[in-house]
Amino acid sequence: MRSLTRRDFVSLAISALASTTLAACSSQNSGSSSAANASKDPVTLQIFAANSLTEAMDNAIEIYKTSHPWVSFRDSQYLSSGDLNAQLQSGAYADVLISASADKMDIAQSKGLIVSDTRRDLFNNDLVVCARQNSGYRISSLADVVSGGYKLAVGDESVPAGNYACQSLYSVGAYTSAEGRGGFFVGISPLLDSSVGNVCKHVQSGQVDLGIVYLSDLYRFPGLEIVYEIPESVHDRIIYPGAICTTSSKQEAAQEFLNWCKNDTDAISVWQQWGFAMA
C-alpha cells in the first residue's frame, strides 16, 4: 500500500489538478512532430474502462490526441468492470479493456474477450473510508466504522469496489465471506450501490455518513475527506489491468495507446494527478 501520508496531500492535489493538467497538455503539444504526424493513417479507438477511471482517462485521451492527432476516440464506455465484460460477451466492440480488478480481467481472459499476451498491470489504487468534509468523525479502525452507529454505503458485490469493501469488513466480522462476495452482513445494514461513484454521491448528499471507496474517488468528487485508510492487508491488492480486446481490428494502434498509458511521462503524470499509482 502507498504511504499513508498521501492523505495529507489529497486536497492540495485536487486544487492543483486543473493547472498541472494544462501544463502536461502543453508539453505534449509542443513536442509533437507535424511532419511525422502527416504520414499516419487516421484510426479510431474504442476504450472500455472501469468507471473509476472516467475523469482520468478522459484527461489522458485529450493529451494523447495532441501528440497523436491521427488517432480519434469513440465515446469511451465507463462502467463497472463486470458490466464491461458482459457487454463484450454480448458482442460489443472495443479495442482496449481496462478493468478495476484482476479477477474481472481473469474472467475476460477465460472467456476469450482479450488477447492474453497483451495483458499488463497499469495502475494501483487504495481503499479508504470517506465522509463529508469537516465531519468531525474520529475513526481509527474498521471496528469503529462498524460499531459507531454510522450510516454506511458500499458497492455491491457486482463491482470490484464492493468486493474490496466486503473483504475489509470480513476482517472485523461484519461480513461472512473472505472473498467479498456471496456472503451477508453482520451487525450492519449498509446502503449498497452498483457504482462506486454513486457511493460517493450518497456521502456527498448526506444520505449516509460514511462510504468505502477508492482513494482516487476523492479526486473526482469534491466535498469529501478521508477519515480512515484501510490497510491493504485486509483486502486484495487493487490492480487495474489493461489488455487489447479480441474484437479489435486496430490492434497495433491499441497496443501503442496501452504502451503510452503505461510508460509515457505525461500519461503517468495524469494518473498520479487523479490519485492512481503506477503498477
Where do the model's predicted regions map?
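N-terminal secretory signal peptides and thylakoid transit peptides that target proteins
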Residues: M1-T20
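Exported/periplasmic ABC-transporter solute-binding proteins
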Residues: C25-T66, Q77-G82, A86-Q89, S101-A102, ...
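A generic structural motif
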Residues: H68-R74
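Periplasmic-binding protein-like
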Residues: A94-S99
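Short, glycine-/small- and polar/acidic-enriched structural segments
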Residues: T118-L127
